[in-house]
Regions:
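The −1 position to Zn-ligating cysteines in a subset of zinc-ribbon hairpins
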Residues: 17, 30, 54
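A detector for short metal-coordination/catalytic motifs
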Residues: 5, 23-26, 35-125
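Internal active-site segments that recognize and position negatively charged phosphoryl groups
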Residues: 1-22
Length: 125
């Protein structure tokens, strides 16, 4: 029930659009936890402010710490990516969004504490 509530709430908050690209194909957007699900308490798991709506590519990059969202909602890409990959796709898909801001949700703004957790414990420096 909590997962269903979380997913529906995050999709609604972002109006079904990836907060990075604006892409809205339902099968390609994922309600991603900012603070990872496995370390959340029960209330954090269901809290839509602990969510970003991301397309599948950015969901995976975010979960793996290859990118993060700073408290001012700016996207930052890991030095791991910057220093290790210089192919065109990496430049376009990851480095191309660095420094841009995510599209703000109409409600349930990303929780600053959850963003801080991701920045400190998930993001690869």
């Amino acid at each position: 029930q909590a997962r269903k509530f979380f997913r529906k709430s995050v999709i609604s908050a972002y109006e079904g659009r990836c907060c990075i690209t604006g892409q809205s194909i339902p099968q390609m957007v994922i309600a991603s936890h900012i603070k990872p699900y496995y370390v959340c308490d029960k209330s954090e798991r269901a809290n839509p402010a602990n969510g970003l709506l991301l397309n599948a590519f950015y969901d995976r990059a975010f979960d793996q710490g290859l990118m993060t969202v700073l408290p001012d909602l700016t996207i930052q890409v890991s030095d791991y990516v910057k220093d290790g990959y210089d192919d065109q796709n990496t430049r376009d898909w990851l480095l191309g969004v660095e420094g841009t801001k995510i599209i703000r949700p109409k409600r349930f703004a990303p929780n600053r504490d959850m963003l801080a957790y991701h920045n400190e414990f998930v993001f690869l420096r």
